[in-house]
Amino acid sequence: MHTVLITGAGRGIGLATTRAFLGAGWRVLALDRDFSSFDAKAPGGQGALEQIRFDLTNTAGIAALSGSLGEVNTLVNNAGVLYCDPYEAIPEAHKREILAVNLEAPVALISALAPQMVARAQGRIVNIGSVAAFTGHPDLWYGITKAGILNLTKSWAAQLGRHGVLVNAVAPGPTHTDMYEQLPQSRKDMVSRSVYSGRAARPAEVAEAILWLGTASPEYVNGTTLDCNNGSYPR
């Protein structure tokens, strides 16, 4: 049975991705710091689930954690933090948390798990970016970190591609998650006007794209960002 590590698995896109991999028969290592709303039932799936409670702001502890996981075939760097702070009044603690969870933790996880993937000449890494990487996003540090995620996707693909490891990203548009629900109604109305279907994505729709890149996409799809934004940023 293949194993996937999914960060931010407790809710939203991470929870939907957990269900998708379980439904495909995978062993899922679901990592989050809060499982209070976690329900990962996947009808008909033959997968296995293990919960890992870990705070990704503890970037210094990631190497030891990764060493305890055993073989990981696919890594999904999904965990993310967003605060709706005005740019002129961003608390330093919020900035540090966003940088740690959204950018530093994915780098640390890839650094820790890539050697075993290289040794097997097989592995897949899927980083979750955002349409915020391409736009002038009102949540300043969130946009910065998501742009960084897409850059590091290409950088790691260039380093690992010759060793049989695929590194790709998914850049979702507005998606019905806890983060989305934090937005003011004016932002939600803007979202409805910006997408072709007039609605935010369902987490399960984004999870389907992640599952494909994490399990079945062609080997020549590498260093690529898959847009999943329904026209909110056509390019």
State each model region's role.
Residues 90, 136-144, 155:
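Active-site loop-to-helix junction immediately N-terminal to the catalytic Tyr of the SDR YXXXK motif
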Residues 86-87, 91-99, 180, 191:
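Substrate-binding pocket helix/loop in short-chain dehydrogenase/reductase
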Residues 110, 145, 153:
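Active-site helix of classical SDR
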Residues 115, 158-159:
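Alpha-helical segment proximal to the catalytic Tyr-Lys
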Residues 130:
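Residue(s) in the substrate-gating loop at a strand-loop-helix junction
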Residues 222-235:
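Short C-terminal tail/terminal secondary-structure segment
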Residues 161, 166, 221-223:
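Short, small/polar-rich loop/turn modules that mediate ligand/substrate recognition or access, typified
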